[in-house]
Amino acid sequence: MLRGSIVALITPMNEYGHVCETSLEKLINYHINNGTKAIVSVGTTGESSTLSQEEHINVVMLTLEITNKRLPIIAGTGANATSEAILLTKKFENTGISACLTVTPYYNRPTQKGLYQHFKAISENTKIPQILYNVPIRTGCDLIPETIIKLSKFKNIIGIKEATGDLSRVQKIKNSVHKNFFIISGDDTTFLDFIQLGGHGVISVTANIAAKIMSNICHLALNKNFKLARFMNNKLIPLHQGLFHEPNPIPIKWLAKKIGLIASDTLRLPMTPVSNKTRLILEKALYFSKITAK
């Protein structure tokens, strides 16, 4: 079972908008050396929506190669067409990828029946373990607990990344699924409460630049030391909040460059560079967190 701090890894690009392998390697080694438990490659934070499918696959495979079995790799493989999600997921079978993170179909807003059939089809047509991903603010549809519980019965659907921020869902899901089905927060601002209610960790944006402290907080929380975990997390709250002052991954890429983890904070359109107003917010949050240059 995946537990603890899992990073939703950014995809570093050079000034021309091409994937920067040097920065990617530096970033991955930073996580290996600072307690991150797994890497999500080319999810939302990894700019999956602006990479071609060829680039998407290449970044995941490069991440796998650099990591060299030192951490589990989870590949983002969601799509708004079920057939496309199946094809992309199958690309990672027999590669060494530990699991695929499959977001709910975005834009077309299916019913709960449609969502069930979508994930059922992926499960039945692929062998690799699947992690469901629910983030209604981005996709326009909500995978409700009752549907998650039904889907948990499929052998290769092993968990859920729950990014609604609705803490009432944690125990509702946990009390109705088998013991090996893991429930991971996808919301840095509420992840500690999420773990206290029975969750198993977080897929974190903040961890991109705060790997060690996020790993330590999760370790403390999973071992029921919530007093110290909260004390440590309090230093990160302005950062958790500031990272979503503009759409992810705009702020986190700027911060990763600022502290020297990546060489450039280049994004692809329609994502644009961070505003001066947000930079000030992020600089204050960085100072408060005491995170230093790498």
From Swiss-Prot:
The active site is at 133 (proton donor/acceptor), 161 (schiff-base intermediate with substrate). It catalyses: L-aspartate 4-semialdehyde + pyruvate = (2S,4S)-4-hydroxy-2,3,4,5-tetrahydrodipicolinate + H2O + H(+). It is found in: Cytoplasm. Its EC number is 4.3.3.7. It is an enzyme of class 4 (lyase). GO terms for biological process: diaminopimelate biosynthetic process; lysine biosynthetic process via diaminopimelate. Pathway: Amino-acid biosynthesis; L-lysine biosynthesis via DAP pathway; (S)-tetrahydrodipicolinate from L-aspartate: step 3/4. The keyword Hydrolase does not apply. Gene3D superfamilies: Aldolase class I. The keyword Lyase applies. It holds the Pfam family DHDPS. GO terms for cellular component: cytosol. Keywords: Amino-acid biosynthesis, Cytoplasm, Diaminopimelate biosynthesis, Lyase, Lysine biosynthesis, Schiff base. The record marks 44, 107 as: Part of a proton relay during catalysis. Pyruvate binds at residues 45, 203. One of its GO terms (molecular function) is 4-hydroxy-tetrahydrodipicolinate synthase activity. Homotetramer; dimer of dimers. Catalyzes the condensation of (S)-aspartate-beta-semialdehyde [(S)-ASA] and pyruvate to 4-hydroxy-tetrahydrodipicolinate (HTPA). Belongs to the DapA family. This is 4-hydroxy-tetrahydrodipicolinate synthase. It comes from Buchnera aphidicola subsp. Baizongia pistaciae (strain Bp). The gene is dapA.
